[in-house]
From Swiss-Prot:
Name of the protein: Nucleotide-binding protein PMT9312_0481
Entry function: Nucleotide-binding protein.
Signal peptide feature range: none
Record has Heme as a keyword: no
Record keywords: Nucleotide-binding
Length: 165
C-alpha cells in the first residue's frame, strides 16, 4: 500500500474538443439563414479565438453559438475571456476571445492557502501552473477535491483534479 496519496490541480481544456466546437460553429454559421452573407469568420490560434463579422447582432449570435457548442462538448465556459469589440477595416467588427489555461501564481497561492487552512494534514506544493496536493488519507484528499470545486466558482477559473494516486 502506498505511503502517501496525491493528485494534481490543473486549469486546462481539451484542445481537440475546442477545435471540434469551432468546426461545428463554422458549419452552423454557413447554414443558418440569419447568418448567411454576413462574412463572419471564426479563427483559432494557439491561445485566442478571433471573430470577425459585420454587425454586433451577428457577433452576439456567434458568441451564443460558441457557448452552446462548448457546453455540448463538455468545455467549461470559464476558459473564455471575452475581449473588447474593435472596429476594423471600415464596417467590420472583431472580437478576440482569450483562452484561459494554467493557474496563475497568485491564484495558486490562494488555493494553497485555503486548502492548508481547512486541512492541516494535507501538503500543497506549487509546480509552475499546477498544484500537487498530497496526504496520507484518501478521505482528506476527496474533501480537498470538493473544496477545490467550490473555489472554482469563486475564482472564476476552470479547475480539474488529475492523476489521483
Amino acid at each position: 500500500m502506498a505511503e502517501s496519496f496525491s493528485f494534481d490541480v490543473v486549469s486546462d481544456f481539451e484542445r481537440q474538443e475546442l477545435v471540434n466546437t469551432l468546426d461545428q460553429v463554422k458549419r452552423e454559421i454557413s447554414q443558418r439563414y440569419d447568418l448567411k452573407g454576413t462574412d463572419t469568420v471564426v479563427d483559432l490560434d494557439k491561445e485566442n479565438i478571433f471573430i470577425t463579422t459585420n454587425s454586433e447582432l451577428t457577433l452576439n449570435s456567434v458568441n451564443d453559438i460558441i457557448r452552446q457548442k462548448a457546453i455540448k462538448r463538455n468545455l467549461s465556459l470559464k476558459i473564455f475571456d471575452y475581449g473588447e469589440i474593435e472596429t476594423v477595416s471600415g464596417n467590420k467588427l472583431k472580437q478576440t476571445i482569450l483562452l484561459k489555461q494554467g493557474i496563475k501564481q497568485e491564484i495558486a497561492k490562494k488555493i494553497s492557502k485555503s486548502i492548508r487552512d481547512q486541512f492541516k494534514k494535507i501538503n500543497v506544493s506549487i509546480n509552475g501552473e499546477t498544484l500537487r496536493v498530497s496526504s496520507k488519507s484518501k478521505n482528506d484528499l476527496q474533501l480537498a477535491i470538493k473544496l477545490i470545486s467550490q473555489l472554482e466558482e469563486s475564482l472564476n477559473i476552470p479547475l480539474k483534479a488529475n492523476n489521483f494516486r
